[in-house]
């Protein structure tokens, strides 16, 4: 067929749309003619990394995604797990990295808004948000502004929308100087028998546009998110979307109401690539065609072209396939909430994606090839070289153990994140049981007794040093954090942030991390049910640390029995659970005290993780554990200091065993470990049981007093540790560049 073309399709125009020459040749063969500008834009949106996962799909297929409690795995807007009593948890994590670097406030707000829509599109009411934020070195001139804007954006949207932000991560490293990471996670609650999906069904069904009007904001956002940055990237502000949390709140209530009234056949939020991606995905998943009439699309700007409307990423919009007999009711509901409602098309049996505007056909394309049959690459990849193991006795301690503790507790890596999370409303809705600052957030489900344990974890320096072990450790850390509050990890969502996949060494990092993640998910019985891939996180050829963020969701049968990390009382025994070898490779101590960022990261024994976690969870459920904290960044002594600070109670600690190197004993980052306190009356019984089941356990001290003191070393006031722990971030943010 003939479609009028107002723009000459040149190699430069093709390249500016993020399409490689061979991909353009594939388009020519597929449609048998030169595409129109609108069609080129549609292919650009659907075939970029952000929407098609063309570089990662072949490897993602190897991830474990099934379990008896998984109701919906990857491929929909979000994952869904069954938690009993006809209740389901709907959750996903997604990145908004590139927009947040260009315009930090709006980039972060729309990242939160987008992930919330993914959750309530499935029929769930959002109950919590988390995030993982990675910034450049503190001394970099842009870092302070980016931190300020992103944190304000995350808080501004979540607080206004009315969902608590209950946990997350914040890190600083020079490798994020040119590419910050903003990974947002949302969790919702739905009826297990009322989950809504994106696949259209039925021919001639009306396709309805819902929500806010379409403007020119966000043009080409998905394509920008699939490319490297260069020196001019900050000029791309027009491609950053603008969010309105109050409009999204109205959209949430309207969507849940039409769902409750059985109006919906299929529903899809308009996220990346806007109207294009939502319409194509609904049709392709249902083996149907879609006809759109753009003259019916509500717009807030005059003179918008078909190209602009199809690629706009204006926020707070949905596309729905409606039951025809419910049209009047659905329209009434949306008008009640003050939102646009317009029938913009119909499903067809043709498997074609047809777009009309001004009485002319602007696009006529095969819908399956746009969607789930987009290009698939098996890119060359090479494994990361193994780094040498650093033996503890090879590392001389430049500081005494107390001096090292005082230094580390206030570093950017280990200091308190209170300045960040106090800007988030973490108690709105009234269901937050454990606030930020612990191992995992705990949110009760309605009136209980069940609760959810929620966490986000990854250690990027481990992933770069050994992608396989780093991938395993990210999942194991999520498992430990959920366990430490008394939860059982049920499933995870991942957000895979990497550099340029066209470089074999970067592709090797992705493949290695996925291998480790897969092994850990299988061993810890926690399938992946949703996720996101963000590639090309590079600026001028310099990539980020590989950062596969893991969002974990666990279940507590009784939220009132959850554990916290704070010391509860004096004269309680302090137990170290798990093997300690003093692993210093890639540790915070080695980097920030010794000035060496090197060596192999700690190996992850998944069998030990499972065994130790089961025992600790059992202690929490039995009521014998009075405080629990997993040991991670900074090692054993940092964990103990955090417990002392949280409880306002000191501890007297035994010296490191004679067979160990003291600084490695206290600051090594061996995995599968916890600190647990128990009452003296329970000590013998606990130690006997742990020995019986083969779990390493050592009493290392006793709680009490106002200082943290190691036999033979200088004691440190807990209040001094708290001051050092809390000081750095507020002081940094208050300073001037």
Curated annotation (Swiss-Prot):
Sites where the protein binds Mg(2+) 2: 118, 269
GO cellular component terms, A-Z: cytoplasm
Keyword Flavoprotein: no
Pathway: Purine metabolism; IMP biosynthesis via de novo pathway; 5-amino-1-(5-phospho-D-ribosyl)imidazole from N(2)-formyl-N(1)-(5-phospho-D-ribosyl)glycinamide: step 1/2
Enzyme class: ligase
Entry keywords, A to Z: ATP-binding, Cytoplasm, Ligase, Magnesium, Metal-binding, Nucleotide-binding, Purine biosynthesis
CDD domains with a match to the protein in the record: PurL_repeat1, PurL_repeat2
Catalytic residues (UniProt): 50, 96
Ribonucleoprotein keyword on record: no
Residues that bind ATP: 53, 92, 494, 531
Primary location recorded for the protein, binned into one broad class: cytoplasm
InterPro entries according to UniProt: PRibForGlyAmidine_synth_PurL, PurL_linker, PurM-like_C_dom, PurM-like_C_sf, PurM-like_N, PurM-like_N_sf
Pfam families: AIRS, AIRS_C, FGAR-AT_linker
Catalysis: reaction(s): N(2)-formyl-N(1)-(5-phospho-beta-D-ribosyl)glycinamide + L-glutamine + ATP + H2O = 2-formamido-N(1)-(5-O-phospho-beta-D-ribosyl)acetamidine + L-glutamate + ADP + phosphate + H(+)
Gene Ontology MF terms in the entry: ATP binding; magnesium ion binding; phosphoribosylformylglycinamidine synthase activity
Subcellular location as annotated: Cytoplasm
Entry's EC annotation: 6.3.5.3
Residues annotated for Mg(2+) 1 binding in this entry: 94, 532
GO BP term, example: 'de novo' IMP biosynthetic process
Domain of life, source organism: Bacteria
UniProt similarity note: Belongs to the FGAMS family.
Subunit structure: Monomer. Part of the FGAM synthase complex composed of 1 PurL, 1 PurQ and 2 PurS subunits.
Functional description taken from the UniProt entry: Part of the phosphoribosylformylglycinamidine synthase complex involved in the purines biosynthetic pathway. Catalyzes the ATP-dependent conversion of formylglycinamide ribonucleotide (FGAR) and glutamine to yield formylglycinamidine ribonucleotide (FGAM) and glutamate. The FGAM synthase complex is composed of three subunits. PurQ produces an ammonia molecule by converting glutamine to glutamate. PurL transfers the ammonia molecule to FGAR to form FGAM in an ATP-dependent manner.
Name of the protein described by the UniProt record: Phosphoribosylformylglycinamidine synthase subunit PurL
Originating species: Rhodopseudomonas palustris (strain BisA53)
């Amino acid at each position: 067929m003939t479609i009028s073309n107002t723009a000459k399709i040149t190699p430069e125009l093709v390249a500016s749309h993020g399409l490689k020459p061979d991909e353009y040749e594939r388009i020519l063969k597929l449609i048998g003619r030169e595409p129109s500008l609108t069609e080129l834009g549609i292919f650009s949106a659907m075939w970029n990394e952000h929407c098609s996962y063309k570089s990662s799909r072949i490897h993602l297929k190897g991830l474990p995604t099934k379990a008896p409690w998984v109701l919906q795995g990857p491929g929909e807007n979000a994952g869904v797990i069954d938690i009993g009593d006809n209740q389901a948890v709907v959750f996903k994590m997604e990145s908004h990295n590139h927009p947040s670097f260009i315009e930090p406030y709006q980039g972060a707000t729309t990242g939160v808004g987008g992930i919330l829509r993914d959750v309530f599109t499935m029929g769930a009411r959002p109950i919590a948000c988390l995030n993982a934020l990675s910034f450049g070195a503190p001394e970099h001139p842009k870092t302070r502004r980016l931190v300020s804007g992103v944190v304000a954006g995350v808080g501004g949207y979540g607080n206004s929308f009315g969902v608590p932000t209950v946990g997350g991560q914040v890190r600083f490293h020079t490798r994020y100087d040119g590419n910050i990471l903003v990974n947002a996670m949302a969790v919702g609650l739905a009826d297990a028998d009322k989950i809504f999906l994106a696949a259209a069904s039925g021919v001639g069904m009306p396709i309805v546009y819902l929500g806010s009007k379409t403007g020119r904001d966000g043009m080409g956002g998905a394509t920008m998110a699939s490319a490297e940055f260069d020196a001019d990237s900050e000029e791309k502000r027009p491609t950053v979307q603008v969010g309105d949390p109050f409009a999204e709140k109205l959209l949430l209530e309207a969507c849940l109401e039409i769902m409750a009234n059985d109006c919906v056949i299929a529903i899809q939020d308009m996220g990346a690539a806007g109207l294009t991606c939502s319409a194509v995905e609904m049709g392709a998943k249902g083996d149907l065609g879609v006809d759109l009439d753009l003259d019916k699309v509500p717009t807030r700007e005059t003179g918008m072209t078909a190209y602009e409307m199809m690629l706009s990423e204006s926020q707070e919009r949905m596309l729905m396939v409606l039951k025809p007999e419910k049209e009047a009711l659905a329209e009434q509901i949306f008008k009640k909430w003050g939102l646009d409602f317009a029938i913009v098309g119909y499903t067809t049996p043709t498997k074609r994606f047809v777009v009309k505007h001004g009485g002319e056909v602007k696009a006529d394309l095969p819908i399956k090839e746009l969607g789930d049959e987009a290009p698939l690459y098996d890119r060359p990849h090479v494994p990361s070289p193994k780094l040498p193991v650093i033996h503890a006795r090879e590392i001389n301690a430049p500081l005494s153990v107390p001096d090292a503790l005082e230094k580390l507790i206030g570093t950017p890596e280990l200091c308190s994140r209170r300045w960040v999370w106090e800007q988030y409303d973490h108690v709105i809705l009234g269901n937050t049981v454990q606030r930020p600052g612990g191992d995992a957030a705990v949110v009760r489900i309605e009136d209980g007794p069940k609760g959810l344990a929620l966490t986000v974890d990854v250690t990027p320096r481990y992933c770069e040093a050994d992608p396989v072990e780093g991938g395993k450790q990210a999942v194991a850390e999520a498992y430990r954090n959920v366990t430490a509050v008394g939860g059982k990890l049920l499933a995870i969502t991942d957000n895979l942030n990497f550099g340029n996949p066209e470089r074999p060494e970067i592709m090797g990092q992705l493949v290695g991390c996925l291998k480790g993640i897969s092994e850990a998910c299988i061993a810890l019985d926690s399938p992946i049910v949703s996720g996101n891939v963000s590639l090309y996180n590079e600026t001028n050829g310099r990539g980020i640390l590989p950062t596969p963020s893991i969002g974990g969701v666990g279940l507590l049968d009784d939220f009132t029995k959850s554990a916290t990390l704070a010391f509860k009382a004096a004269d309680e025994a302090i137990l170290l659970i798990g093997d300690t070898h003093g692993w210093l490779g890639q540790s915070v101590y080695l980097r920030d005290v010794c000035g060496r960022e090197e060596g192999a990261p700690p190996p992850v024994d998944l069998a030990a993780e499972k065994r130790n976690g089961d025992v600790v969870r059992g202690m929490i459920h039995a009521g014998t554990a009075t405080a629990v904290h997993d040991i991670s960044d900074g090692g054993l002594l940092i964990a103990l200091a955090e417990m002392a600070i949280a409880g306002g109670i000191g501890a007297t600690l035994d010296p490191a065993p004679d067979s160990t190197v003291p600084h490695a004993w206290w600051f090594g980052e061996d995995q599968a470990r916890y600190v647990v306190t128990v009452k003296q009356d329970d000590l013998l019984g606990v130690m006997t049981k742990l020995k019986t089941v083969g779990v390493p356990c050592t009493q290392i001290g006793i709680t009490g007093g106002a200082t943290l003191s190691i036999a033979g070393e200088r004691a440190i006031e807990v209040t001094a540790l708290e001051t050092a722990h809390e000081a750095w971030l507020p002081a940094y943010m208050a300073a001037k560049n």
